[in-house]
UniProtKB/Swiss-Prot annotation:
GO terms for molecular function: adenyl-nucleotide exchange factor activity; ATP binding; ATP-dependent protein folding chaperone. GO terms for biological process: cellular response to hypoxia; endoplasmic reticulum to Golgi vesicle-mediated transport; negative regulation of apoptotic process; negative regulation of endoplasmic reticulum stress-induced neuron intrinsic apoptotic signaling pathway; negative regulation of hypoxia-induced intrinsic apoptotic signaling pathway; response to endoplasmic reticulum stress; response to hypoxia; response to ischemia. Has a pivotal role in cytoprotective cellular mechanisms triggered by oxygen deprivation. Promotes HSPA5/BiP-mediated ATP nucleotide exchange and thereby activates the unfolded protein response (UPR) pathway in the presence of endoplasmic reticulum stress. May play a role as a molecular chaperone and participate in protein folding. Its main location: endoplasmic reticulum. The modification N6-acetyllysine is found at residue 883. Residues 574-583 have a biased composition (Polar residues). It comes from Rattus norvegicus (Rat). Belongs to the heat shock protein 70 family. This is Hypoxia up-regulated protein 1. Pfam families: HSP70.
Length: 999
């Protein structure tokens, strides 16, 4: 028995340890439940979070604004982000980086890079020799890639979200323009990795806007399709999207609302920035004309002046949207010369006339890609700040054919709210109402490969083949499997973009390389040698276009198949018994279970193998070209049966005949016969058919990225370390600034306090002069040498000053606390004395307190009175400039000791049951006669009437003034049910008038 107990103890300890670990994991998980979204615009970003108790909230930045500039200022020893960096754009435009997202995923010879150079000539861009991309050259020792700069912005957005949520956040959904190609999307993902963010999804900003619109109007969505057009003009680009809303049936959640992207059109350079650049150029021209006769320099050659003009152009664009004209003015634009000029809305519209002509373009592209007409569009909704320009709305009304444009959506925050809803849906920590999102592929992707064919006997040639992998406007996320049937040796194939004819010539040049990846397969021939007796079912390449729209090749496999016959095996007694019992209840052994003993692999493929074995080679080859042997593994076909009839490789005819034979021979499944008798084992063995066995061999893959090489892992790690060092430096800078501000604030506050009466009363002139001199010396040091002081030095200076002023502050603080503490002590002493007096008046037969308890309380009361009077007398003798002997902490200690004794007696009275009353012979309680003498009732009668009422006031709570809970919570009153007080009254032998609630 003892040994058993000893064995159980370690198990119990292990169980408790596991429970503790699980609880710790749950607590840690609860601290990281929040998710965030980043609506990454060209000019500014919006950040939103979802955390337990906070559903979908826009994050306020440090300046309490709902949107933050996407701006970074980089210097040798400091870095600024957000609004701080936007303010530095005027002082140091060369080190202030903006609109750098336009350079993501683009090589140095891209037209978009040349456009960026012309817009912002103050930035120096050099070429990365390995990737042929551009980098910002801040100084000879300082350079950053666009991905690194974006990583800084994403890290800053996470810090804002964490400060707002008050907990760490790692999971995020980031919006990207719908026209981003594979290289641009991978660049954003690399930037997120540098920032340490786990990207749940890259969601297109038009899809996020459509999701936000649908989530808040899900009650209006029904089975009837509603086509909505969203026209989103941002700072850098314009996107027009046609979305269809309707309810659909899902396997997991039943009928749910769905949005489907039907058509997309875009213009990469049409936006508010281009309008501001036109205005900036106009203002620069006006300024040069005003100084034409002064032989001044061209304002365009001054980066700081051009930065001021761009900021004023941004303000002008906003003001002219609501006013017919406005006065542009800048103080000290250049060479201390002020600039002032009047600009009208008509002039602004003339400057941007060619831009307004491009407004209908995305609408036509969206309609063409959706294969819809304007009559099918129910509503056109405006999104984005530049759509507030009146001319944009005027020009847009004509091509959309509507009387008015919809403005019933938050144009600035819709994408952020839709993205954070998707983040909550993708996170395992939240359960949201399902909303099906079907995004669309903008750029088609295909597979190209070359194969030898024999056109004539003895004449062989190479034939180029193309297979569309993901078609234009096809839904994603989606998985596809393509099968190569005519290869038995290693070969290569290429993944490229499909037909991009819908793009204009300029867009094609900006698009970049149309070749994505070259795939080299290794090990195909070895797989055929490994399974010489198996029939090849082709080389299957598994592709995945994930939720972020990023294409990946999951794996490549060589698949073989053969027919095998299971040898009859003698069943054990238990197996026979189990089969017999299951057959009696209509069950049987599943053929799936019989096949589990092999290495067969079940595939999720939609299309059967191409051609049968009886087909001639030419016919099978033609069929391969026509049918494009592609298999979608995202969902099985609805007609595909489950169970044995769904074995891979069967043709529809084989499945039908198989079902028929099984229907005619039910005993093959182990089912009971007509009379309920299970079949004989020998008969079952004879009727057992041959089954197909599939073998899968993994094929080696070597990828060569052609559009834009990804960062090597070592360079990526170097970039991560570079950003971490910058973040650490920023934290150290913030800590130093905090220490300097604390020191400066302490100096000013203390200098002011030295002249306040309450501080002068408790200090001598010499003490104040000493403190004042030290404060002045430290202030001078802070002004002269404080800029180069470290955080430790600043903290040491502050600690030195606090130590010097500690006695002064202590005396003032104690005198502030005395009135409140002494008043509380007096109240507690008075209540305790009254309580003790009432307790002593309780009759002996009803007494619940012992003499020791009451004596102890009386001693504590007397000691406290004595200590208080003595300490006050001693304190009165001391001068105010000396350390006081009456301390607030001592008063609190005395109060705690006295309150502890009173609470002990109160709790005892509350939980003590009343003693039973003695009964006479008639069964009634004995009560003393009303006219009994005082000598007969000396020990039982409560003396004078006034004391009796006082005791009742202490022992019985006021029913009118306090409820039961209030009486119980009062530390100086008994909160019992009142039985003791009633019994004391009966023992007293005095008749009292009954109260209303006792009648």
């Amino acid at each position: 028995m003892a040994a058993t107990v000893r064995r159980q103890r370690p198990r119990r300890l292990l169980c408790w340890a596991l429970v503790a670990v699980l609880l710790a994991d749950l607590l840690a998980l609860s601290d990281t439940l929040a998710v965030m979204s980043v609506d990454l615009g060209s000019e500014s970003m919006k950040v939103a979070i979802v955390k337990p108790g906070v559903p979908m909230e826009i994050v306020l930045n440090k300046e309490s604004r709902r949107k933050t500039p996407v701006t970074v200022t980089l210097k040798e020893n400091e870095r600024f982000l957000g609004d701080s960096a936007a303010g530095m754009a005027i002082k140091n435009p060369k080190a202030t980086l903006r609109y750098f997202q336009h350079l993501l995923g683009k090589q140095a010879d891209n037209p978009h890079v040349a456009l960026y150079r012309s817009r912002f000539p103050e930035h120096e861009l050099n070429v990365d020799p390995q990737r042929q991309t551009v980098r910002f050259q801040i100084s000879p020792q300082l350079q950053f890639s666009p991905e690194e700069v974006l990583g800084m912005v994403l890290n800053y957005s996470r810090s804002l979200a964490e400060d707002f949520a008050e907990q760490p956040i790692k999971d995020a959904v980031i919006t990207v323009p719908a026209f981003f190609n594979q290289a641009e999307r991978r660049a954003v993902l690399q930037a997120a990795r540098m920032a340490g963010l786990k990207v749940l999804q890259l969601i297109n900003d038009n899809t996020a806007t459509a999701l936000s619109y649908g989530v808040f109007r899900r009650k209006d969505i029904n089975s009837t399709a509603q086509n909505i057009m969203f026209y989103d003009m941002g700072s850098g680009s314009t996107v027009c999207t046609i979305v269809t809303y309707q309810t659909v049936k899902t396997k997991e959640a039943g009928t749910q609302p769905q949005l489907q992207i039907r058509g997309v059109g875009f213009d990469r350079t049409l936006g508010g920035l281009e309008m501001e650049l036109r205005l900036r150029e106009h203002l620069a021209k006006l300024f040069n004309e005003q100084r034409k006769g002064q032989k001044a320099k061209d304002v365009r050659e001054n980066p700081r002046a051009m930065a001021k003009l761009l900021r004023e152009a941004n303000r002008l664009k906003t003001v002219l949207s609501a006013n017919a004209d406005h006065m542009a003015q800048i103080e000290g634009l250049m060479d201390d010369v002020d600039f002032k000029a009047k600009v009208t809305r008509v002039e602004f519209e003339e400057l941007c006339a060619d831009l307004f002509d491009r407004v209908p373009g995305p609408v036509q592209q969206a309609l063409q890609s959706a294969e819809m007409s304007l009559d099918q569009i129910e509503q056109v909704i405006l999104v984005g700040g530049p759509t507030r320009v009146p001319k944009v709305q005027e020009v847009l009304l004509k091509p959309v054919g509507k009387e008015e444009l919809g403005k019933n959506i938050n144009a600035d925050e819709a994408a952020a709210m839709g993205a954070v809803y998707q983040a909550a849906a993708l996170s395992k920590a939240f359960k949201v109402k399902p909303f099906v999102v079907r995004d669309a592929v903008i750029y088609p992707i295909l597979v190209e490969f070359t194969r030898e064919v024999e056109e004539e006997p003895g004449l062989r040639s190479l034939k180029h083949n193309k297979r569309v992998l993901f078609s234009r406007m096809g839904p994603y996320p989606q998985r596809k499997v393509i099968t190569f049937n005519r290869y038995s040796h290693d070969f290569n194939f290429h993944i490229n973009y499909g037909d991009l004819g819908f793009l204009g010539p300029e867009d094609l040049r900006v698009f970049g390389s149309q070749n994505l990846t070259t795939v080299k397969l290794k090990g195909v021939g070895e797989s055929f040698k490994k399974y010489p007796d198996y029939e090849s079912k082709g080389i299957k390449a598994h592709f995945n276009l994930d939720e972020s729209g990023v294409l990946s090749l999951d794996r490549v496999e060589s698949v073989f198949e053969t027919l095998v016959e299971d040898s009859p095996e003698e069943e054990s007694t238990l197996t026979k018994l189990g089969n017999t019992i299951s057959s009696l209840f209509g069950g049987g052994t599943s053929s799936d279970a019989k096949e589990n003993g092999t290495d067969a692999v079940q595939e999720e493929e939609e299309s059967p193998a191409e051609g049968s074995k009886d087909e001639p080679a030419e016919q099978g080859e033609l069929k391969e070209e026509a049918e494009a042997p592609m298999e979608d593994t995202s969902q099985p076909p609805p007609s595909e049966p489950k169970g044995d009839a769904a074995r891979e490789g069967e043709t529809p005819d084989e499945k039908e005949s198989g079902d028929k034979s099984e229907a005619q021979k039910p005993n093959e499944k182990g089912q009971a016969g007509p009379e309920g008798v299970p079949p004989a084992p020998e008969e079952e063995k004879k009727q057992k058919p041959a089954r197909k066995q599939k073998m899968v061999e993994e094929i080696g893959v070597e990828l060569a990225v052609l559009d834009l090489p990804d960062l090597p892992e070592d360079e990526l790690a170097h970039s991560v370390q570079k950003l971490e060092d910058l973040t650490l430096r920023d934290l150290e800078k913030q800590e130093r600034e905090k220490a300097a501000n604390s020191l400066e604030a302490f100096i000013f506050e203390t200098q002011d306090k030295l002249y306040q009466p309450e501080y002068q009363e408790v200090s001598t002139e010499e003490q104040r002069e000493e403190i004042s001199g030290k404060l002045s010396a430290t202030s001078t040091w802070l002004e002269d040498e404080g800029f180069g002081a470290t955080t430790v030095m600043l903290k040491d200076k502050l600690a030195e000053l606090r130590k010097l002023c500690q006695g002064l502050f202590f005396r003032v603080e104690e005198r502030r606390k005395w009135p409140e503490r002494l008043s509380a002590l007096d109240n507690l002493l008075n209540h305790s004395s009254i309580f003790l007096k009432g307790a002593r008046l309780i009759p002996e037969m009803d007494q619940i307190f012992t003499d020791v308890e009451m004596t102890t309380l009386e001693k504590v009361i007397n000691d406290t009175w004595t200590w208080k009077n003595a300490t006050l007398a001693e304190q009165a003798k001391l001068p105010a400039t000396e350390k006081p002997v009456l301390l607030s902490k001592d008063i609190e200690a005395k109060m705690m000791a006295l309150d502890r004794e009173v609470q002990y007696l109160l709790n005892k009275a509350k939980f003590t049951k009343p003693r039973p009353r003695p009964k006479d012979k008639n069964g009634t309680r004995t009560e003393p006669p009303l006219n009994a003498s005082a000598g007969d009732q000396e020990e039982k009668v409560i003396p004078p009437t006034g004391q009796t009422e006082e005791a009742k006031a202490i022992l019985e709570p006021d029913k009118e003034g306090l409820g039961t809970e209030a009486a119980d919570s009062e530390p100086l009153e008994l909160g019992g049910p009142g039985a003791e007080s009633e019994q004391a009254e009966q023992t007293a032998g005095q008749k009292r008038p009954l109260k209303n609630d006792e009648l």
